């Protein structure tokens, strides 16, 4: 696939800060791309500050997936060209939704959350989601 697009948007998952994309941002900028790494709504702060505030932040706690999707949809539609989007985990699901809606030129989902209705029974997947979903007795901590 050939694309002349020169803008990349990096979308993080739910449990990390957008700062995790720093090395990717540098890499793609050195290759001549314009790189945007917009944080999720209510997550634009240093990691230490987020760790202290998010478990009790009512704005973040009341946010729904539709709000996050709308946030990124507004970003991609405000650009002069359709960007390439790369997302990890829940960010990968957001990428799939943006691709499905025809809002981006290309999308790459890294270790993506699967779309609704698709579930893997592979032990590695089941084990990975049990703790964040609070399905295990020792999984009651916030992330």
What spans do the regions from the language model cover?
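Glycine-rich phosphate-binding loop signature in dinucleotide/nucleotide-binding domains
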Residues: 2-3, 77-82
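Short, surface-exposed "cap/lid" segments of acyl-processing enzymes
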Residues: 3-49
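Glycine-rich His-Gly loop
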Residues: 10-14, 89, 112
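Active-site signature of alpha/beta-hydrolase-fold catalytic machinery across serine-
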Residues: 23, 97-98
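N-terminal beta-loop-helix "entrance" segment that forms/cooperates
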Residues: 42-62
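Gly/Ala-rich beta-loop-alpha elbow adjacent to hydrolase catalytic centers
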Residues: 86-91, 95
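Flexible "cap/lid" loop of the alpha/beta hydrolase fold
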Residues: 103-140
